[in-house]
């Protein structure tokens, strides 16, 4: 068992671990070690710096509108379903596959939810469970063709995109269906209750954000200590501290902005919980290491004893569930299901993962990177809309950003 775990760990090529390459030695000067580490991990630090730079740019060009509490709340609500799907898409890409059907599945599940709750008056809790199980079944069907029948994921999910786009039209009969029950709408339109109010600031939301930041810092520190105890190389202490303090500061600052409006949205709590769950799964569980091993070198992973077919199958089941959840969140936000819901979502989700550092060849990517990538896309969309940039040029700019991100990844890999 220990040898197998060691073999799995050795197959992970820069995925969830974030370990530095062996370009330095303990005897190397501190400055040289820092420079070498930054050179080999520029992707990780570049993502955070890029997000901060983009936010600063649009904050000043929009005369401060971008970081107004109302607009920050809208940013969270507008990008929540993209972030949710990006978590699943990251695992699919890391495993060496792609899923083009997530947008159509998202729209189909929203349509199914509308028919169940509005037309058949099914209790919203039961309807949500049915929709999530439907997403799992869709992922299982596509996963079987990909993992066991060996049909390329591009073809299977392209077919799925067409099938579920058509099924959404059929279920809705070409019309919009709504409104949803008020309880269901709270998924996207509700905010956590506030037990304290101080000069217009929802103190409960702010304190919760501060607690989340503190928990993140402690978790990262414990993870670092655990890796060091196993003799694995880690990033220099000052870089580790600076990066995580920056993340914590951003969380606290955004919590303050949200608390200055209506508080933390319910969907942000769902999204944050999923982020923590998937970050833990990819960094500290056996199945997480095996997914990175599968994407890094499928043949070697199979020889090491990993059941690669079953792992790929469950990766798509997971993607189906998250696409269904995103469909419910999006439908609740619109308060109606439309035949065009989910159109083009898969492009934003895939772009978020690649911009966030996932490798097109598989085996590389981080949860926090996918989330940052999603918010880079969201901030760009929001900022350009505030500035009055047309949708045509918005698409051009987003395409260029995606191409640049993938080019940098390929360039660094070929150096």
Report each predicted region and the residues it spans.
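Transmembrane alpha-helical segments in multi-pass inner-membrane proteins
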Residues: 97, 316-329, 333-396
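Membrane-interfacial amphipathic/re-entrant helices at transmembrane-helix boundaries
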Residues: 21-84, 120-126
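Single transmembrane alpha-helix segments in multi-pass membrane proteins
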Residues: 55-120, 142-154, 169, 282, ...
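Transmembrane helix-bundle core of multi-pass membrane transporters
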Residues: 164-282, 339
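Inter-helical junctions in multi-pass inner-membrane proteins, predominant
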Residues: 63-74, 169, 173, 255-268, ...
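Transmembrane alpha-helical segments of polytopic membrane transport and secretion proteins
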Residues: 1-45, 218-249, 410-415
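Alpha-helical transmembrane segments within multi-pass membrane transporters and channels
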Residues: 121-162, 372-373, 377
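Membrane-helix/interface signature in polytopic inner-membrane proteins
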Residues: 220-234, 276-316
